[in-house]
Each structure stands twice: as C-alpha cells, then as structure tokens.
C-alpha cells in the first residue's frame, strides 16, 4: 500500500493539535492565575474553579489508591494509538469520523500530559444550574465528549452498508 499521509485520515491530525493546544494553554492560564480551589463566575451558569482530579472524566475513580494515574495513562496511550491507526486506514474524505478521532486524541493527550507532569488532571470548568453542579471538567474532556458524540452521529448518518474507511 503506497499511500501518502495526506491521502489518509491522518491529514486531520491538525485538529488534535488544536484541541491539545487549547487544553494545555487554558490549564496553564488557570494554574497561573488561580489558587487551587478558587472559583470565579464567568457567566450565570459557568464558573472557572481550579481543581485537581486524580481520576478520569467527571472524577471517576478519583477517591481510590493511586494506581488509576498509571491505568488511565496507559488507556490514553492505547486509545490514541488505536485511533491513529484507524485514521491512517481511513480515507481523508471520511471527515466526520476523522475529526472525531482527532478530537479524542487531542483530549486524551492533554489529560495524559497532566497525569504525567502533575500527577493529576487539571480541571476548571464548573457548569451548574441553581445549586446543582456538574463535575468540574476541562477542554480535553470537551474534545473527547464532542468526538464521541460525532462518532455516534456518524453511525446514524452513514448510508447502510458503507463504513467510514471506505473510499467514495
């Protein structure tokens, strides 16, 4: 198979870099300008609240041992590699799936960086309605969630019998 990288889904990796840059940049800004635990209202339903999360998305498994840092790091690496392979095997015209994979890769790498460098994931977006608060999250989590939603949407929108990696 003699394909150039630009003819594959890997040409969408720029989107992973955008998600990664926005994630790391926003976290650096929060760590520089906020005290841990400090909360600042942004708009009526969002605060920026600097938090450390030793668990996974939405603080899943945050309150146990310490092994989850390494387990979630390994999972992030495996997911990123699997999605890179899928992007390589995919045609560049499979825009929705490649964009979704790239966003998930960018988010996974952003949270992986935090786990490796800080030992925890830096979270700061606090969405709330009244007194009910969603678990604090970050830009990487947003990228991962949007990517997952795009994959589900693609599953509903794809013509029957055609896969994302098939060439048009």
UniProtKB/Swiss-Prot annotation:
It is an enzyme of class 3 (hydrolase). It catalyses: Release of signal peptides from bacterial membrane prolipoproteins. Hydrolyzes -Xaa-Yaa-Zaa-|-(S,diacylglyceryl)Cys-, in which Xaa is hydrophobic (preferably Leu), and Yaa (Ala or Ser) and Zaa (Gly or Ala) have small, neutral side chains. One of its GO terms (biological process) is proteolysis. HAMAP family: LspA. Disulfide bonds: none annotated. The active site is at 123, 141. The keyword S-adenosyl-L-methionine does not apply. This protein specifically catalyzes the removal of signal peptides from prolipoproteins. Belongs to the peptidase A8 family. It is found in: Cell inner membrane. It holds the Pfam family Peptidase_A8. The chain crosses the membrane at residues 5-25, 70-90, 102-122, 137-157. One of its GO terms (cellular component) is plasma membrane. This is Lipoprotein signal peptidase. It is a multi-pass membrane protein. Keywords: Aspartyl protease, Cell inner membrane, Cell membrane, Hydrolase, Membrane, Protease, Transmembrane, Transmembrane helix. The gene is lspA. Pathway: Protein modification; lipoprotein biosynthesis (signal peptide cleavage). One of its GO terms (molecular function) is aspartic-type endopeptidase activity. It comes from the Bacteria. Its EC number is 3.4.23.36. NCBIfam families: lspA.
């Amino acid at each position: 198979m003699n394909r150039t990288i630009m003819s594959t889904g890997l040409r969408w990796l720029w989107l992973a870099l955008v998600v990664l840059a926005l994630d790391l940049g926003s976290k650096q800004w929060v760590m520089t300008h906020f005290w841990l635990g400090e909360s600042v209202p942004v708009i009526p339903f969002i605060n920026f609240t600097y938090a450390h999360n030793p668990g996974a998305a939405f603080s899943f498994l945050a309150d146990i041992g310490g092994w989850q840092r390494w387990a979630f790091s390994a999972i992030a690496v495996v997911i990123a590699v699997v999605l890179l392979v899928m992007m390589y095997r995919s045609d560049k015209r499979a825009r929705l799936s490649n964009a979704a994979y790239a966003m998930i890769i960018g988010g996974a790498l952003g949270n992986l960086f935090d786990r490796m460098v800080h030992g925890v994931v830096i979270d700061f977006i606090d969405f709330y309605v009244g007194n009910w608060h969603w678990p604090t999250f970050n830009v990487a989590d947003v990228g991962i969630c949007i990517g997952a939603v795009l994959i589900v949407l693609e599953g509903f929108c794809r013509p029957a019998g055609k896969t994302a990696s098939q060439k048009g």
